[in-house]
Amino acid sequence: MTAGTRTVVLAANSLWYITNFRTGLVRALRDAGYRPIVVAPADPKNEGRLAELGIEFVPIKIDRKGLNPIVELSLLSRLSRLLRRLRPSAYVGFTIKPNIYGAVAASRLRIPVIANVSGLGTAFIRRGALQRTVTGLYRIAFRRAVVFFENADDRQLFVDRRILRPEQARLVPGSGIDLDSFVVADLPSDETIFLLIARLIGDKGVREFVEAARSLRQRMPHARFQLLGGIDEGNRTSIQKPELDAWVHAGVIEYLGETDDVRPFIAKASAVVLPSYREGLPRSLLEGAAMGRPLIATDVPGCRDVVDEGVNGFLCESRNPVSLADAMWRLGSLPEQQRSSMGAAARRKVQEQFSEALVIRAYLNALAGLQRN
């Protein structure tokens, strides 16, 4: 494999992330004359999806949640060797460890860096030694990087903590939504279904969703509350299977498992819900909005960027199942025409502010700027 002046390495902690959220960007890079090379842990299923697109893939071992310093230094070493061999014209990092260690490795080799902070995650939500450690690592890694943020709150936090300079930080509307893939579906007229799409971790507000559903059983006896997403064993706030099974057994929620295609589930839902503690720019809300679904979310960074109170949905207080239940009750009590109007407003907002084309243009412009410099 030879190095090329137009090679761009894109790295993430899972190949699933790239194939589900960044395929449009990878294709656009290829079509613009770049040679994109994706770097992530081995994943035969998603490697096949990349191969179908004719995109090169290099597997690398990443312990997504581990904090062992020896293991972390080993990852830095592997990324350094890989980038020294490929000598790309730019390194693009997604997710926390490829962002930090990839940026450090690339900077040492004088390879320009673009990093994407798609949310601050558990390390920033929960204060303490871990937050201080991650802040310090970001400060080292992003010294010379161009950094894309998905909401203004996260951008300002990094600037205020002097992790980076204001001129390094740019806003981009998430990973963008392919509006040709996510099309409007008619709202169900015969039942009310609230759908939460998320990894099963506490920080996504899963327990608040369950408690809100439990409290609404008498007021809304015919409403259904559905949970779609996989158990994230490695996360410190992960929901464990016995707890999930108890909710299902009690008839509080329906668990739909996990999927690579959320569209059929959104099409059957009346509203998409996300009671998260903090987000970058929540894709589940954007996908629901693109399909014409009213939204219910917490009034926190990321979520409030997508939901306009009373226009395309309702906001509620974070970590407050009573407030969440009230928002779901308000939406469920609306006449069908008003729900449809909210769904139409949600779709328009995605078209105007969050389309994939806007995101791709931002990355191509950033790469062109790096080439000029």
Residue ranges and their predicted role:
Residues 39-45, 197, 224-239:
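Glycosyltransferase donor-sugar binding loop
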Residues 58, 139-184:
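Donor nucleotide-sugar binding/catalytic pocket of nucleotide-sugar-dependent glycosyltransferases
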Residues 294-297, 307:
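Short hydrophobic beta-strand element within catalytic cores of glycosyltransferases
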Residues 20-21, 70-77, 112-114, 121-143, ...:
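Nucleotide-sugar donor phosphate/pyrophosphate-binding loop at the beta->alpha transition
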Residues 258, 277:
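Aromatic "clamp/platform" in nucleotide-sugar-dependent glycosyltransferases that forms part
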Residues 330, 337-353, 359-362:
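A short, well-ordered alpha-helix in the C-terminal region of glycosyltransferases
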Residues 186-204, 210-214, 226:
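Conserved donor-binding/catalytic core segment of Leloir-type glycosyltransferases
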Residues 308-310, 314-321, 330-336:
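Conserved acidic donor-binding segment of nucleotide-sugar-dependent glycosyltransferases
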